[in-house]
């Protein structure tokens, strides 16, 4: 019986579709496999479709500035101008991130022009060409929107860190806080700037794509201002100007190699490539002495017999509102560093009324937090109005602002919280002005075994009225 002889056995063919090199335009051969131009085009289409889907999935749901502002109002008291500025800056930042994701996916999709198209590719070529044509006709198509990192100016305890935390919550992105004073130049003892990115990656549970949309708050940024004076050349400023130089690239946007564990000082570490263009950096600091620089500049501007000297009576927060890049440069920030923080917002010093509102009004106000803690033990915790105002007064005198409120309440309630779990008959604790000032202790209302529930509530009300009357 005769054998069928095939003369195509030695002819190179595509490993994927089986076509020979004579049936396709181009055949790319490898050591153990080959692929034709049609299969390559199909693979590119598949990858392009996945990129578009990934862009849609990874794009953040973007609340409008007014919605961000309303959310901040629920948790942050006062600072209206700062909240408005931050709402707009965050909206524009993540709008840019979403726009870049979409443009990147469309650019890859638009590059898939192949003459040997399959029927599926031919169907998809029309919208692809339409997008490409639309993009070529758009005069703004090649415009790149720069990052809008944020600089917060204001004294300690006015809510700079808390505002950044609230922004991360409303955007549902990873968030990390770092202290600029712990950062040093690469090669010196301390944390280098890549450590900040490593912490953000950990906050994102190792998800690089999610970390690339996170928020990093760098506190005490004023502490890395370059030193000035006669002795600047004696010792190297490893935690000042050098850190600013190291931060420039990641603030602007770069591909950084971030160690998954340990630090860059440990060799042979696994690293992740992180794109910092989508990371929002918020830098905050008290900038003590900056108001003097502004006042001096304004004084130089208005000289002569007809000069207006109203600037000498301006408050610090009013002076900070007039800060410009030259003032920050004279303070010690590099001009390049200032340029990468284009959005500047000033937070005003909090008043007694502001602190009183902070204690009671926000969704997670401190008073509500302690009331919830006491409620777990079945105890009703009450603060009189005079007590709340006394807490605010002490915080103002100490110069700690909102940051010091918790420590004052802790000190006031410490003995009560120590004894309370062992006292089964206490049903109400009343904190008055005297107990906040330390001249007395919080009032404990005990429940007698034979007292009906209705009479107990009356007794609680009477005791609270007596305390309020005594304070008045």
From Swiss-Prot:
Span of the signal peptide? none
Where would I find the ClpX-type ZB domain in this sequence? 1-55
Pfam families per UniProt: AAA_2, ClpB_D2-small, zf-C4_ClpX
Q: What keywords are annotated for this sequence in UniProt?
A: ATP-binding, Chaperone, Metal-binding, Nucleotide-binding, Zinc
Which Gene3D superfamilies would you find in this protein's record? 1.10.8.60, ClpX chaperone, C4-type zinc finger domain (6.20.220.10), P-loop containing nucleotide triphosphate hydrolases (3.40.50.300)
| Chain's role | ATP-dependent specificity component of the Clp protease. It directs the protease to specific substrates. Can perform chaperone functions in the absence of ClpP.
Mind telling me what this protein is named?
A: ATP-dependent Clp protease ATP-binding subunit ClpX
Starting at the broadest rank, the lineage of the source organism is:
Bacteria, Bacillati, Actinomycetota, Actinomycetes, Bifidobacteriales
